[in-house]
Amino acid sequence: MDNRPVGVYDSGLGGLTVWREIRRQLPEESLVYLGDGKNCPYGARPADEICRLADEAVGRLVGAGCKMVVVACNTATAAAIDFLRRKYRQMPIVGMEPAVKPACLNTRSGVVGVLATARSLDGDLFRRTAARYGENIRVLTAVGEGFVELVEEDREQSPEAVETVRRVLEPMIREGADQIVLGCTHYPFLLPVFRQVIGERGVAVVDPSPAVGRRVGPVSYTHLRAPET
């Protein structure tokens, strides 16, 4: 077994939702977490700036001896994942994919809502995924305005959090969305608020973090298993 750590990187605290899933699913793995709190949030920054910040962060994790890196940030994945995989070809890099597929497969109403940062929603990865799985599905999108700041400032259980989530979520529910995709790793910290706002209306919230955790094990095994002797 390769005992080097797995690096997990995010713009701030959001990637801890992914870190938690990797720890739960792969307790034998050592993990190193890097949160770029100095530059958080990334959502409205230009793509080239996000790419530079992601490069610096991944470079630090490579320098720390990580065997692979999980870019636990949807915005950084959208802006930089192709560049990172080209530059750091010697190691596997796992990114965040929008959980549009399971939402589209499970919707009963034919309407899916996706909450993410502006940069993520503008990215090719989201557009390709929505086009591939969203045929005959109405995909609504909205920026989670203020969500990241609530989490970073430890206000996710405040009355302000309830009103902030309600303001963004209610229009999607009124339009018939029965699946809400959390397209930013900060957003799962607000899950109790989402459930409070949704109540008994039968709307599912899709968190992509468990799926990323499930990907890390096979990628690690495929790329990093020791050669037979």
Residue ranges of predicted features:
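Non-catalytic structural scaffold of enzyme domains
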Residues: 1-225
